[in-house]
Amino acid sequence: MRLKFLGTRGDVEESSRKHKYHSSLLVTHKGFKLLIDHGLISIPLRKIKPDAIIVTHAHPDHFTWLKKDEEYKGKIYVTRETKRASKFKKNFEVINIDKWFKVGPFKILGYRVIHSLIAPAIGFKIKGNKTFIYNPDLIVMKRKSVLKGIDLYIGDGSTVTANLVRRKDSKLFGHTRIQTQVNWCKKYGIKEAIFTHFGKEPIRWGDKKLEKKFKQEEVNVKIAHDNMTMTL
């Protein structure tokens, strides 16, 4: 599998040369191009030419069709909530939560994560020749057992030290820290982790400072940047 981070920026005003576009990942396997998320500030789909798109949730930095139409005739796999939130009619396929489904050569599991009150989110466990997790926006997974048997964890880089967990009544929303996710990797024996979807604090820190902060032996932590590619 070939992974290309088309964008690595969250829904923040801050940006940099390395973090310009909203977080999006292109996964290519056996000639099939799977795009994960496509926000308002993204490379045009006519240039990416994905065979299918899967979407984590209906926030504008992940789902352009909340505010702006973009022509695409392929299938877009979304939750029921995301489909309802779309202002434009597209070729949507509804994801059944906690049930595996097939897209091209990939087996995919969409599972609930706690992140937003108005746009319920999911993460993805994706199997090709290897298995990886994609959690660009979350506080916590509702079922951490999805972390078992993972070759790579791709997670939420919104915050390093700032507490971005908020509460309304008894419900939580927001983002967890990078270190919390690294600790999950340690617990489940995941040796490789990459962070994307950077917020204000991490963008101001810069990639070199982030890499130094999280350099360790148990988990090989990498900081993704726009146009970064890797083979899994």
Language model features with spans:
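Conserved beta-strand hairpin/beta-sheet module of binuclear metal-dependent hydrolase folds
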Residues: 1-46, 120-137, 152
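Metallo-beta-lactamase
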Residues: 6, 78-129, 224
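Active-site metal-binding loops of divalent metal-dependent hydrolases
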Residues: 8-10, 38-41, 57-58, 113-115, ...
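Divalent metal-coordination and catalytic microenvironments
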Residues: 3, 57, 108, 124, ...
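Cap/insert and terminal regions of metallo-dependent hydrolase folds
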Residues: 141-228
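Active-site environment of divalent metal-dependent phosphoester hydrolases
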Residues: 59-63, 83-85, 101, 116-118, ...
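Active-site metal-binding motif and surrounding structural segment of the metallo-beta-lactamase
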Residues: 34-79, 150-153
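Active-site regions of enzymes building and remodeling cell-envelope glycoconjugates
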Residues: 50-54, 71-76, 88-98, 107-108, ...
